[in-house]
Amino acid sequence: MARKIFKYKGYTLEELQDMSLEEVMELFPARQRRSLKRGFLPRQQIVLDKMRKLNKEGSKDGRPVVIRTHCRDMIVLPEMVGTTFGIYNGQNFVEVTIEPEMIGCYFGEFAPTRQKVQHGDPGMGATRSSMFVPLK
């Protein structure tokens, strides 16, 4: 079975990577377009510079290099596809490898800050009514 070719608003990944930032910006939704029109923040520029440097020289031992960042408001650009980022979620760094489907999204969407609480069985002293729960 043939693998489906990724397209973002009718453009393939190669076409997106050949476009300038201004041309790609016009394809993004309004919120991302507005953010990019204002320019990159200094911390976002640092992330971009690190990524471009590592993509140019590559890793020394063949393993993918993880770029760690606290910058959760960075927008995924076409040139980032294939790069691995460690995105901080407030407790630790979540490793995310950027795929073509992530273009136009924010880093923070891939590293949730809250986890669903999973409560255990009530034990002795867990609640007022647990005084009558037999001990296991």
From Swiss-Prot:
Source species, domain of life: Archaea
GO cellular component, one term: cytosolic small ribosomal subunit
Claim: RNA-binding is one of the keywords in the record: yes
UniProtKB keywords: Ribonucleoprotein, Ribosomal protein, RNA-binding, rRNA-binding
UniProt GO molecular function: rRNA binding; structural constituent of ribosome
Function: Protein S19 forms a complex with S13 that binds strongly to the 16S ribosomal RNA.
Protein name per the record: Small ribosomal subunit protein uS19
Species of the source: Methanobrevibacter smithii (strain ATCC 35061 / DSM 861 / OCM 144 / PS)
